[in-house]
Amino acid sequence: MKNNYTSLKSPLDEEDELKTDHEIDLEKGLLPEYNSEEEGTLPLYSDISKLANPVPEDSSTGPTEIANPNVERRQEFKDSHPNIYFLLRLLISVLAVSVVFFTAWVCVNPLEKSIFGKVAFSVTIGITCPILFIATFCFFETWTQAVAQCIKVTVIFLAQCVKVTVIFLAQCVKVTAVFLAKCVKVIAVGLYNSKKDLVVTIWLAWVVICFILFGCVKDGRLNLNKALICSTCSISAALFFILLLVCIPIWTLKHMLFGLFQVLGVQSCVVIVTKGLMYLFDKHIDATGYEIEASSLFVIGNFLFFYEMECPGALKRMPKFIRNGIASFLEGIGNAFGGIGNAIGRIGNAFRGANDNNNNIPLEETEAESEV
């Protein structure tokens, strides 16, 4: 049998239903897609609006802002324990006034008999202390927030300073270690490539001569003066000259003489600067001072000569290396002063932010408090 089912709805009613199915509410937006597999009915428009706007809005203040947890805890403590909060403010205000009072008492007490002392003490007691008490008690939240921000910024700045200092020292240690490692490598390679027996013989002769010279100085039979300094440097340079000429023939005579004169020039500059500084400060070098100077020049001369032989042009590049080191040091100082300036700016922003937070009180809350 055929199902002769006829709809009781008129054609106009069917057209209205088709229109309402495809119409969209502009205020509520599109309907969510319906999953036929899941049980349940379609969500209501009220649920959709809650999901779309999870943050509640207030008609007067707009969207709520994320509050500071410290401020919230302070407000909760203030609301739950108003008497304790009042006593705390009063105690801190009295302590601040007491510190100022006793400071003025200690400082002005010696001048108590003079007119200036009496006026200063009267002004401190009559004007400064009441103003300080009122400011501390009434603006307790403002200045405590400012102090907290100041402490936070100071701690961050000190941590950054420590971090920069540690990094700078680590870089200095790294550069020094690399430089010393290269020097040791150069010396080791040079000694390894030379004849071992001759190296040991010349080295022992060099050490014996050094001990004889310094032993004579200790006994007083030899006055250590400029001649001894020059002779010590010359003997050391000559010994290395013979060693390098015999053992390592790749180093030409011209190159060795050029390096020797460069080293003597550096030593002469060191001696001139030392003598000039001693003359400027009206100091005289005794035997110990001459001994230290001779030992330093002895070691420096041999080291520079050997380094110049292994790395030709090293002495010419040394001023550039020194300039780069000084520039890096000055750059670090400039960065440190820049960090100090940024810290001062952050402290100012902290005070400004604390004042803005204190002034940003809604108008309706102030009106409600006035009505109460």
UniProtKB/Swiss-Prot annotation:
The keyword Magnesium appears for this protein: no
Q: Name one GO cellular component term.
A: membrane
Lineage, please? Eukaryota, Fungi, Dikarya, Ascomycota, Taphrinomycotina
What family is this?
Answer: Belongs to the WTF family.
InterPro entries assigned to the protein according to its UniProt record, in alphabetical order: WTF
Question: Where does it reside?
Answer: Spore membrane; Vacuole membrane
- Leader sequence range is none
The subunit field of the Swiss-Prot or TrEMBL record says: Homomer. Interacts with other proteins that exhibit high sequence similarity.
What is the organism of origin for this protein?
A: Schizosaccharomyces pombe (strain 972 / ATCC 24843) (Fission yeast)
Task: Give the protein's recorded name.
Answer: Meiotic drive suppressor wtf18
Give the gene name: wtf18
